[in-house]
Amino acid sequence: DLANELSRNGRRSGLTFAPEGGSERMRKVINKMVTEEDLIRTVATAYGNGWRQVKLYFMCGLPTETDEDVLQIAELARRVIETGRQVSGTRDIRCTVSIGGFVPKPHTPFQWAAQLDHETTDARLHKLRDAIRADRQYGKSIGFRYHDGKPGTVEGLLSRGDRRVGAVIEQVWRDGSRFDGWS
């Protein structure tokens, strides 16, 4: 059993899972064949074996994504906490939702997909944050981390641009920028 093997040394700090799409519909779009029930069964095993924290990684701005797809992340995190409390017998369960913006990359199935503007990405993430905070029963057990959308726009330009982007990078450097906001 993988959960037992991972915790054999007694350390159970946390496990990370990457459903990536907020809804099953989105996971099908990106060909990530993990159902909600698969994930719930997996976190139940983790919590049942003594783990107290899981992290769920998602992307926002995927092709065909809607606000509702993103808001499904709050419901999934709620189910994770509920399941963890049931199988562990304790309320001391945490789930951190971490979200990065989708950046189309060359030589991938979505290389020609449009990148969502950062204003829309940020608006969706603020709605999600508010939905998590509004959950009186589970919200305090759900952490929420996301990256501002602007650096993702730059990443999209750098990853899909051609040699002409070099002149832009040089000019930005001459103007005094040094990877500001990148870590």
Identify what each model region corresponds to.
Residues G48, Q86, T90, T108, ...:
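Intrinsically disordered or highly flexible coil/loop and linker segments, enriched in small
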Residues D1, M59-L62, T90-P104, G143-L158:
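A glycine-rich phosphate-binding loop feature that marks nucleotide/adenosyl-phosphate handling sites
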Residues R78, G84-S88, Q111-D122, K127:
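Long, polar/charge-rich, low-hydrophobicity segments
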Residues Q115-R129, V165-S177:
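Acidic, Ser/Thr-rich peripheral helices and adjacent loops at domain boundaries
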